[in-house]
A protein has these predicted regions:
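Generic alpha-helix detector with strongest preference for long hydrophobic helices that associate
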Residues: 6, 21, 25, 29, ...
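Helical mechanochemical/support elements of P-loop NTPase systems and associated helical scaffolds
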Residues: 21, 33-40, 44, 50, ...
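Residue-identity detector for threonine
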Residues: 35, 42, 54, 62, ...
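C-terminal engagement/docking regions of AAA+ P-loop ATPases
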Residues: 107, 127-277
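Conserved AAA+ ATPase small/helical "lid" subdomain
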Residues: 63-139
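Canonical AAA+ ATPase core
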Residues: 3-79, 121-133
Length: 277
């Protein structure tokens, strides 16, 4: 191989055979070799004309574009799938949060494969939830993010001195992403009316078994919720559908909780939001 690359010939039983090949050899390598095998030997490395160090996507938009290009989101023909842009952005932001986390090994790296896998598992969980409820409309919601730690754990290396903190660290990454997307898309001046409604002893339950229509009724019950929901769905094609409204409502409620504007009690796949007063 070394001779072919450099001298374009090879020795066969003492006879030199010319191989004037017009080829280009391109090789890729991971940031870290886990087995200490398969490293490029120095003479071979010397034959490469250039060594190019690439990097992960530097911004969320690029990460989202890769997700949309690479993720396999095919579902059964009798299901109607729509993934809100803000949900895909949350998935991409989880990956960026992992790349900045001191609890995640940056030497091992956090590949874009994490974003792709998380998008696919998010949709898979939404499909499961829709089938259980007997609905053919599939729109991922905040409750579907509970599946992400399982798909994330196998693609990152967690560094912590404390045993059993893996789940907590991964859940924290998801929460960071939800809060970041909430702050980016929901104007602060739309929060006040929603928080005021909860201060009047309003309690709202969410969960996998809560139907899309229940969120439409919630929107009528809390008129102030319409402004932040509209801000999230303003660029969505199917903004008026109950499933899209449900997804946006859950992000608003979860975002307000993470911003310390609402209290939340969670247990057994359900959550209850109430005022902090």
């Amino acid at each position: 191989l070394l001779n072919v690359l450099e001298e374009r010939d090879v020795q066969i039983r003492g006879h030199k055979v010319r191989l004037p090949l017009d080829v280009i050899l391109v090789a890729s390598a991971n940031p870290e070799d886990y087995t200490n095998r398969g490293r490029l030997i120095t003479p071979l490395k010397d034959r490469f004309g250039s060594q190019i160090r690439t990097h992960y996507p530097l911004d969320i938009d690029t990460e989202v574009a890769i997700i949309e290009q690479e993720a396999d989101l095919s579902v059964s023909a009798d299901l109607d799938l729509t993934v809100p842009a803000f949900m895909t952005e949350i998935v991409a932001t989880v990956t960026h949060a992992a790349r900045a986390s001191q609890h995640i090994s940056q030497r091992s790296g956090v590949s874009v494969r994490l974003s792709i896998a998380n998008e696919e598992i998010l949709v898979a969980n939404a499909v499961r939830r829709s089938l259980r409820s007997g609905s053919s409309r599939v729109v991922p919601r905040i409750v579907d993010l509970e599946a992400l730690p399982a798909s994330t754990s196998g693609k990152v290396e967690i560094e912590t001195l404390e045993e059993g903190r893996d789940g907590e660290i991964l859940a924290s990454l998801v929460s960071q992403a939800v809060l970041a997307v909430f702050k980016d898309h929901v104007p602060p001046d739309t929060h006040r009316g929603v928080v005021d409604a909860f201060e009047e002893d309003l309690v709202v339950d969410i969960g996998e078994d809560v139907t899309d229509d229940a969120y439409v009724r919630l929107l009528k019950q809390i008129p102030a919720l319409e402004a932040p929901v509209h801000a999230l769905l303003i660029d969505e094609e199917d903004a008026e559908s109950p499933a899209m409204i449900a997804s946006a409502c859950e992000l608003v409620l979860e975002g307000l909780h993470l911003a310390k504007r609402l209290n939340k009690d969670a247990a057994a796949g359900r959550a209850q939001f109430r005022g902090r007063g």
